[in-house]
Amino acid sequence: MKFNHYIIKGQNLTELQAQQDGILSAHPQQQVAFKRYFLPDNSLLRQLPAEEGAVSHIIQPVLCEGSVALWLVLCEGFRVRYQGCETILEGEGFRLIVTASLTCPDGTSEEQTRSIFDAYATLLQGHGLTLEGNCVRTWLFCDDIDHQYAGLVKARREFFAACGLTPQTHFIASTGIAGRPAGQPAAQPAGAGTPSFAETREYAPSGVPAPAAARAAIVQMDALAVEGAFTQRYLYARTHLSPTYDYGVTFERGVRLDASGHHATLISGTASIDHKGNILHEGDVAAQTRRMWENVEALLDEAGDAWSNVRMMLIYLRNREDAAFVKPLFDERFPDTPKVFLHAPVCRPGWLVEMECIASA
């Protein structure tokens, strides 16, 4: 079981495709397990090739290095099958199912999220799997996150509870971040006086629906499910991070997966937070970056991993201009780690930066 992660960046899709072709030619024994394109807007969609399997497209503008990027995951040692929006990887005694770009473009963010999880549960059922028993990682993208995320959170919490995913059992490692489903118009701005996610903290609002004539996808999900000879261990780092349910959300901070003598540690979206759920270093993006690293390191330590095993990073910034401060910090500490900086506001306005990563050995 082997995975290689590549972050490819370019000024246009032609550059991206040329780099991808070079990587694939250099590794003919490897097959594509997953792709995610990070796009500045919808103008490039017609230039993208038609591709089968788990291929994700999200509007999250690339900062600093080019205007488009691709997270490419190659695998070796699997039988690979592409089926609709899924890539199915079969090994000896285990199976991985990667799903991409699930949307249900009708209704509020709450209604769309519920429909997406319904659809995903149905897909898993077709493989003889369940959300609660087999899904280990999700990525949830939410347009107009400051006003639409509350509905997403409410729907996910209620759906999980109905599946038996509670504080007494476990949740699923996840990133919840701003991102517009590709091909969709921007979400209609919330009306004056509409409470934001950060203002409510009770997550009561269900999101603001777009006008009937302009229904569009607000929420998109990618996911990973596993079956068979895997052991999984959820990560908490309670000395540094609070349980997510303390502030009303329902995901795990990370998960370590082991199979066939290999392991992967999937770290969820992580920001500058303390063990009581408070934002640390408000207004100081450099200090938030350092605390974020400290939190991620605590999770890696708990997994028995280290920065030296990290194979890729995604870094999300609320403010475009902060890339000029954050990128040099990452480049100095992690000069050789594949990474990309994206304009994607975090779920609370006070958080200026968030990151996720994958470690393996």
Model-predicted segments: where are they?
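N-terminal presequence-like segments and the immediate start of the first folded domain
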Residues: 1-361
